[in-house]
A protein has these predicted regions:
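Intrinsically disordered, low-complexity segments enriched in small/polar residues
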Residues: 18-20, 55-56, 116-117
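A short, structured loop/turn motif at beta-sheet edges
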Residues: 74-76
């Protein structure tokens, strides 16, 4: 079976990042309350809990297929994911405090790129 979900650990934040590529609802059975992507959706980002093998909180980014992993979509979903993770940690971000979101969004984008290039 071809892998469709990859897990990443940001180390300094108490949440995981999961990247799904063409993952179906069945592939995501270990996650809590996840629905199929709508037909018109290219990618989405969702704060979520994984229930098996142990309970973990984090963010799931799903792409319909490898071709949908474009610069535009990676940037868009990376910012959503970084905002979700920082919000969970109580980190406030604004014009005078841009570094946390910039670094975290960059890390998320790098994780997505590794999935796209098959480097994980």
């Amino acid at each position: 079976m071809k892998k469709k979900i990859w897990e990443f650990d940001p180390q300094i934040y108490p949440q995981k990042l999961w990247i799904g590529l063409g993952a179906t609802k069945e592939d995501l059975a270990d996650f809590e309350d996840i629905a199929e992507m709508e037909d018109s959706t290219i990618a989405d980002t969702t704060p979520i809990r994984k229930l098996k093998p142990k309970k973990l909180g984090g963010v799931l980014i799903r792409f319909r297929n490898r071709l949908d992993i474009s610069f535009e979509n990676v940037t868009h979903e990376s910012v959503h994911a970084a905002m979700c993770m920082l919000d969970y940690c109580g980190v406030k971000f604004h014009a005078d405090n841009q570094e946390p979101i910039a670094y975290l969004a960059g890390w998320v984008a790098d994780c997505i790129d590794k999935v796209k290039r098959g480097k994980v």
